[in-house]
Amino acid sequence: MARLLYRLGKSSAAHAWAVILVWLAVLALAVGGVAVSGVHLSNAITIPGTETQNLADKLKAEMPEANQGTGRVVFYTEDGSEFTQAQRDGIEDALKATEDVSGVDSTVNPFERQQQLDDGRQQLEDGRQKLEQGEKQMAQLQKSLPPGVSPEQVLQQQGIDPNQLEQQKAQLEQGEQSYERMGDYRVVSEDQNSAISVVNFTQEQNAVEADTKTAVMDAVRAHPVDGVGVEFSQEIAQDITALLGPSEIIGVVVAGLVLLIMLRALVPAALPVLTALLGVAVATCITLSFSGAVDMMSVTPMLGVMLGLAVGIDYSLFVLNRHRQQLRRGVEVRESIGLAVGTSGTAVFFAALTVMVALVALNVTGIPFLGLMGTTAGLAVLVALLLTLTLTPALLSLAGRRVLPKKQRNAAPHEESIDEHNVPLHLRHPWITTLACAAVLIVLAIPAQSMRLGLPDASIEAEDSTQYKAYQRIAEDFGAGENGPIAVVVDLPEGLSKAEAQEKINVVSDQLAAQEDVANVLPGQLTDDRATGVIQVIPESGPAEAATEELVGSIRDLNGDLESQEDVHVGVAGTTAANIDVSQLLGEKLPLYLGVVMLISLLLLLMVFRSVLVPVIATLGFLLSALASLGAVVAVYQWGWGGALFGVHDPGPILSFLPTLMVGILFGLAMDYQPVSYTHLTLPTTRLVCRYRWSPCH
């Protein structure tokens, strides 16, 4: 391998412009592929076979309106006073403008909806009063009737059907039960200064285009109402389609500055960054060109972007650093490039191989979006490796001795010396250092035992974002659970009449209302064939809280009694339930992924180094690092320790697929630096001997 890479590096250096043109052609083809196929990304996190996904498919076929995407617009008075009639009219105009947006099916006027709720409650109250008055009159009439004459006979003589009265009484009781289950459900706050409007889209939630969401916000903002503020929920305001954000750009800039300071020359500082950016561009374009052929999430290319930047800079820097050392010893430029690729390049090759194994192994989880994310990230690492072995030598050849600081370019060759008497403290006492580091990592890992997984809601958004403000206002004025309603799907027996089906729905609704952490149970909807019903449940707690997760489990546990007593089956659907299912499945798959990756990569390192100690040290180091990292993440983002330093204002569950991705990335980096460190553990004199052996220094 070292001889092959030596020849590859030297050949690339000799034909520098040809190599550069080839890579520019590859980039052009990749960009052309994206231009031809287009970019088709989705925010959907779907796992085939889960209950929520099966129910979503069922609703899409049987009750399309129940599967429509929705978003909420929160209106509020800026001074906290009640809405005036002029403000209500202005809000109505803004909502009507929203209905003209392509992709919007309808909007719900909160004031009309609240009036309907209030009227319904008032009608029930009036009906109850009339019923009580009628019962009193009936009792008085019964006392005054002669013997042998019943009240029913008198009612019939007056043209009143007694059976109809009983039916009206039953309907009244059903209405009262329905409103009792609804509790204090409102869409306009009790103090009349906050209101929630629902925007119904024509597409399902995860298929709503970002342009449609933006157009909704623009339409509302184009009709400002004096004294009224407006915020948009996460379903409308969130957009995660940007592949490069401020953090990535800042990271590249900081990396460039660090390289400039350490290398003390502009050319060597720019070279690793340039190759990394080219690698990310090629890999990302190739990935996006396939987005029309496979279901691809918006975040799928992001892992490749982050890893591509990291390893692209690292790999190129390893070769560059070896090349600079050899130039200082007087080795000719192209010969030095070949030797650098043959030595450091060999370490980079096997390091990249282990990283790719760790990433591609994400497919063993059986979770499509995670496997695809790992595969595309593996592609980014592969491109970074190929660039390091070909383009980096070409650029080094063109740079010549300018990769050295000016003072060193014409200096006499010299050997690097090692002061054997000035050994660092941690090397003089290796066992103490090892045990101390292990103890610190173990302590950091302790919080990982209480890790709870989930998918983020709007509470993690920036405090000045519209989706965070909407989330908080809804929670304060309408209850935390209003941010994450749960859809309960009821499978009914065949052949039921509408009344019989509604009775089954009422029984299920009563069971749901009796569960802990339930705030409101809204009236159920039936399909035309009365085979399926949908009931919306609003929890007391927020969508990412543990109590909501327990509620979903409690609802599913109702099936035992409901199936035996009512011959119905209930399932839980909706975004909140889907997030819970995805998180649970990812948590179950994490140990499997960890075990498979460690086993495969351990075998790879055993074959590469033909040693047991080096792979074992690398594996144990990774394991401790991974557990400590997970523990630190839990302490900060779930417990809130030091949250102010990291911008954590609302601690909550850990992003469900973060531990799996973190394990993959940390393992890749651990196995990345271990081969490089081991390859570089040689004295300068040994390196010179290696020059004539055509092999890496060991």
Report the location of each language-model feature.
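Alpha-helical transmembrane segments
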Residues: 39-40, 47, 54-59
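A detector of helix-start/N-cap boundary segments at the beginnings of structured domains
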Residues: 42-46, 184-185
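Membrane-embedded transmembrane helical bundles of large multi-pass transporters/channels
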Residues: 1-39, 44, 201-453, 567-568, ...
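Structured non-transmembrane domains adjacent to transmembrane bundles in polytopic membrane proteins
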Residues: 52-56, 60-67, 84-229, 450-639
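Short active-site-adjacent helix-start/loop capping segments
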Residues: 79-83, 116-117, 239-241
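Short, compositionally biased low-complexity segments
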Residues: 26-32, 66-70, 190-194, 445-446
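Acidic/histidine-rich, surface-exposed loop or edge segments in extracytoplasmic proteins
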Residues: 71-78
